[in-house]
Design a protein with these regions (language model features):
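Radical SAM enzyme core and accessory elements
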Residues: 162, 170-203
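Gly/Ser/Thr-rich beta-alpha loop segments that engage phosphate groups in nucleotides
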Residues: 1-2, 38, 177, 185
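Conserved AdoMet/S-adenosylmethionine-binding subsite of the radical SAM
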Residues: 2-163
Length: 203
């Protein structure tokens, strides 16, 4: 979580944008991504760094979001939306909301409708990300997370676009066939390392 390392992250951003530095990257070309660290968002909104803000939202109601993103138990969706609105009001930059679509978990018609409602007062872009399945399915509590079918992805995207005035995009995920898409490779490597660690070593 970048905003838990606020000083280091903002120092790096300043070095990247420095006019006498080697990179000279403008603030409008840099984005800070967060899982929803509300105090960090508010602090960044007061900073002189005019960078973009991307928030991993991933659910439209607190019960589901708290299951898949424990940070929500501390800063629920209402607080997160208020912080995002504050960021826009102070910076004048659209916020990006990242939203992972999981079959029968976050891809319901009601989710599309709620997503349009909770973002209605915040100038933003909504980036839909189809879930990249792990094999076997990653299970948390009583839920197994799966990627929605193409038909369900299209239905959600279409419904959201019809319900909101915001820009809605859907990420084209690549590398799933070799478990190298977002979130997959790390899990495969971690599982392999765990298997090696559990193998008895010769005395």
């Amino acid at each position: 979580e970048p905003l838990l390392n606020y000083e280091q992250v903002t120092c790096a951003l300043r070095l990247a944008r420095a006019s006498d530095g080697q990179l000279q990257i403008g603030g409008r070309k840099m984005t800070v991504s967060t899982a929803g660290h509300v105090p960090g968002i508010l602090r960044l909104s007061e900073d002189d760094l005019n960078v973009g803000l991307a928030i991993s939202l991933n659910a439209t109601e607190d019960e589901t979001r708290s299951q898949i993103m424990p940070i929500n138990r501390k800063w629920p969706i209402a607080d997160l939306m208020a912080a995002a609105k504050t960021y826009f009001d102070r910076k004048g930059r659209r916020v990006t909301f990242e939203y992972v679509l999981m079959d029968q978990v976050t891809d319901l018609d009601a989710d599309a409708d709620r997503l349009a409602v909770i973002t209605s007062s915040i100038p933003c872009k909504i980036n839909l990300i189809p879930y990249n399945e792990l094999a076997p399915g990653l299970q948390m509590s009583d839920r197994v997370y799966r990627r929605p079918s193409s038909a369900r992805l299209d239905r959600f995207t279409r419904r959201l676009k019809n319900a909101t005035r915001h820009t809605v995009t859907r990420r084209d995920s690549r590398g799933r066939d070799i478990d190298a898409a977002c979130g997959q490779l790390h899990r495969r490597v971690t599982d392999a390392q765990s298997a090696v660690s559990a193998t008895p070593q010769p005395a």
